[in-house]
């Protein structure tokens, strides 16, 4: 694959990632930065991210901070400098383990709320709680099997 073909393929990959992640609440910049880091062979500096994506360094900083905060990127310190490097995590289990725990907490909250509720509300809360627990358990199972 030529450099031009590789660049075009990476652009398509980043654009597709945007279309997939926007419904999940990711901004265009965050989704493109995530895809960029996933496609890179080596960690990137903020300057590289900003230059390669054609965005302001402040936007690259905001995007990487958000990705790091949710476990979708890793921040590395470059020895002997203040410069930071960013890379995609080697495992995606972190953000999904956090989501699994959140789903179980939501299910607990729904179960607590059922007390003293009417029949229809109790049934609705029970169904939602069961769904959330099943999703949390499914995530935990995948992490155990593949993580």
Question: Over which residues does each language-model region extend?
Answer:
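N-terminal leader segment of winged-helix/HTH proteins
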Residues: 1-24
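Short helix-capping/hinge SLiMs at alpha-helix to coil transitions
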Residues: 23-24, 38-41
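Short, cationic-aromatic polyanion-contact patches
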Residues: 24-29, 45, 78-99
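A short acidic, leucine-rich amphipathic alpha-helix
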Residues: 48-51
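Short, hydrophobic-biased segments on the C-terminal half of alpha helices
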Residues: 64-65
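Glycine-centered, phosphate/nucleic-acid-interacting loop/turn motifs that mediate DNA/RNA or nucleotide
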Residues: 71
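C-terminal regulatory/oligomerization modules of transcriptional regulators
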Residues: 115-147
